[in-house]
Regions:
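Basic/polar phosphate-binding segments, predominantly the helix-turn-helix DNA-binding elements
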Residues: 207-239, 251, 257-284
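Glycine-centered loop/turn positions within well-structured domains
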Residues: 55, 81, 230, 242, ...
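A short, N-terminal "cap"/entry segment at the start of jelly-roll beta-barrel domains
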Residues: 1-20, 150
Length: 285
């Protein structure tokens, strides 16, 4: 049943790559109520606009977050993503990179001293950062959705459309709002972040990751917290929560096989699920 649902979902995702290999800047995901859609690793940072319906999202350090019609949020490059339709939903996805300036003095690639980075505890308690889509922006997004699904947008036209979206974000939202939603992307250490995501695997621990980065523990820990906003151990644990949930929801792997994937015993995996995901593995499927 899950494989059938996944295939249906895949068929309703407009193309992500052009024939010449360039990534599509916009694509549309249609997902039905009860249907699952997942990505093990997102290749590009994404702006996600929920145009219709309601979904349950797990991505990065956030687990089982609800995103409703009229809301937008960010999925970060290198993160995994799991989406479940709570209602029939339409999501417009727009890829971007760290050079995309949002307003004067505030770009995704440069931190600013004007705003305080949230603590790890604040990140967890506040949940996935999201903003309401204002009516003027929603009108443009629905037009783009229609153009994408009608195959009317070439690459250059998509670049122009993305520029319009960026301009509208800069015009309709203030710096505080943009910082709130893009705060994790606005790391001033993109090279370090990308290198961490390159070496990251589902079974790695903080000590092994530090060794691959060829840094002293003190330097690695300092730079990791600056780039990701929390200690490495907390980040790895949060990532594991999302990945275990994806494995339970979207694969036919046994509990023993899932535990082996993360170098855990089945009993430890059961305790992990009860503690962090709220139930035993069999009930989470």
């Amino acid at each position: 049943m899950q494989e059938t649902e996944m295939k249906k979902s895949e068929q309703r995702l407009t193309r992500e790559v052009y024939e010449d290999g360039r990534p599509s800047l916009f694509y549309v995901l249609r997902i039905r109520k009860g249907e699952h859609f997942s990505r093990d690793r997102v290749c590009y940072s994404l702006l996600a606009f929920v145009l219709e319906g309601e979904v349950e999202m797990s991505t990065g350090i956030y687990v089982k977050e609800i995103a409703c019609e009229g809301q937008m949020f960010v999925v970060h490059k290198g993160d995994n993503g799991y989406t479940k339709g709570l209602k029939d939903a339409v999501i417009l996805l727009c890829s971007f990179d760290s050079s995309m300036a949002l307003c004067n003095g505030l770009s995704l690639g440069n931190a600013t001293e004007d705003y305080k980075e949230p603590t790890p505890e604040e990140r967890q308690s506040q949940g996935l950062p999201r903003l309401e889509i204002k009516s003027m922006l929603m009108t443009e997004l629905k037009l783009i959705q229609h153009e994408v699904e009608s195959n009317l947008l070439g690459y250059r036209f998509m670049e122009f459309k993305r520029y319009i979206i960026v301009y509208m974000l800069r015009t309709l939202y203030n710096k505080e709002e943009l910082f709130y939603m893009f705060r994790c992307v606005r790391s001033d250490d993109f090279d370090f972040r990308d290198k961490v995501l390159h070496f990251y695997t589902c079974d790695i621990n903080a000590q092994e990751l530090c060794a691959k980065m060829e840094m002293s523990s003190a330097t690695f820990n300092r730079r990791f917290k600056r780039a990701f906003g929390m200690p490495c151990g907390e980040w790895l644990n949060s990532k594991r929560q999302v990945q275990v949930l994806m494995d339970l929801k979207t694969t036919d792997l046994s509990v023993k096989e899932i535990a082996g994937k993360y170098n855990l015993t089945p009993n430890y995996l059961t305790d992990f699920c009860k503690r962090f995901l709220g139930d035993v593995p069999v009930n989470l499927r």
